[in-house]
Amino acid sequence: MDRMALVVGVNYYSDKRIQNLSGCVNDAEEVARLLKHNGDSSRSRNFDCKELYATGPDHAVNRAAIKDEARRLFQSKAEIALFYFSGHGYIESTGGFINGSDSTRGDEGLSLRELVDLANGSSARHRIVILDSCYSGAAGSVAGMENHAAIAEGVTILTASRSDQPSLERKGHGVFTSLLINALEGAAANLTGSITPGSVYAHIDQSLGMWDQRPVFKTNTDSFVSLREVDPAISLDDLRKLKKLFPTEDYEYRLDPSYEPRDEGRTDAMPPAEPRNNRVFSLLQKYNRHCLLVPVGADHMWNAAMESKSCRLTLLGNHYRRLADQGLL
């Protein structure tokens, strides 16, 4: 398998001065469950996940274990190497840290600088680091990294909060990972069913208020990468029909009452419903529901048909039309 993920959740900390957490392991387990298989009807395999969970004294995850497994991950020949951590984080003037069960001080954790160095030096084409910990936004920042480049080509970092913010738990679950899980389940999917790091960030960012913790997204990649696939909202065959129905970007598709299958509102002067046009209209309505087209001179598609108006593509619709025209769907 060319996709590998290291998923770490730390609830338990051996030092009594460090508060144990309640939702990190559950969050990490759910992230791993979603990464292992795609969410489309085929349920095809996705990431090969290594899981480290600290739940108590007999099941601790120490800093050395996190570092060793992170090194193994980023030294692999995987196409995509993904690191996820949920647990305590710490920041000081020299940078940030993520803390294993054996941490007695915040700066005894795995440094974010060291983690980013491992990702930067990896031969994997795509290296993705996702951190749900306090002050995780320090990862990839130039400050405190001296002459190190923040992130190398092919590296993407998504963190729960900025370098000066704590990460929040509500009802035993991290706010960030709850939204991450929602995104991976399909809320961040595009129309073709792909869930990307960028779409995950956009979903999380748009779901939080200005007074909440703010996620951080940093990437240095020029190629498309999908974290997970779900069933597309519109079939690829239907999306490919855009270029036939709309020969040009500014083309307006003319409608008339024969496109509407129902007789409600139809007068004797109007043409009857025509099955072929009804099938086309059903597809146009599907495009409209997914913001690919809008009626022209009418509030709704029904009005556009019954009043012999037209419909045209939106900017998003033209984007998918171009993809279809270029053979990219």
Language-model-detected regions and their locations in the chain:
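Caspase-like cysteine protease fold
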Residues: 5, 189-273, 307-319, 323-326
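Active-site-proximal C-terminal subdomain of hydrolase catalytic domains
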Residues: 9, 35, 127-218
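Short glycine-rich anion-binding loops that position phosphate/pyrophosphate groups of nucleotides
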Residues: 11-13, 86-90, 136
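Glycine- and acidic-residue-enriched helix-capping/strand-helix junction motifs
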Residues: 14-33
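A short, glycine/acidic-enriched catalytic loop
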Residues: 22-26, 42, 54, 58-61, ...
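Functional beta-strand-loop-alpha-helix junction segments that form "active/interaction loops"
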Residues: 28, 32-79
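Short amphipathic alpha-helical interaction segments
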Residues: 273-295, 308
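Short, Lys/Arg-rich nucleic-acid/phosphate-binding segment
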Residues: 297-306
